[in-house]
């Protein structure tokens, strides 16, 4: 069975296990912090971008003009990743705390997640259990 596990299957299994652990933590009222979700999301997008190129290079002969297309597609993939990341940052009620704007307040042992955009911004405060896990229930909200 181990001979059929490629590096991409192992990575996809790790990403799936992360999401399953997040949902199991959700049963106990806990969640991962945006730090872990941001790394997870970037790793998933990077893996989804690299896998087709590895398949392409395994089935084709190397030519220099492919590098130009790879660089251009890398730029387009980065823009798509940023747009999806920005979308998740502005969704007011998301079960996944993927966010651009968050602050850890160590004195009060809480994390502030800023949701929304410009005119309708919401600051959600969550208690931190440890630096990587927070309580999923919002402690209090401040709306601007």
Predicted features along the sequence, with ranges:
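Extracytosolic and intramembrane catalytic regions of membrane-associated proteins
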Residues: 2, 106-108, 112-144
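Alpha-helical transmembrane signal-anchor/signal-peptide segments
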Residues: 86-111
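Sequence-level detector for tyrosine residue identity
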Residues: 12, 57, 102-103, 125, ...
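Short amphipathic alpha-helical "recognition" segments used for binding
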Residues: 55, 67, 74, 125-128
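Membrane-embedded alpha-helical segments of integral membrane proteins
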Residues: 9-58
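Membrane-interface helix-boundary motifs at transmembrane edges
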Residues: 1-6, 31-33, 55-69
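Internal/C-terminal transmembrane anchor helices
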Residues: 62-92
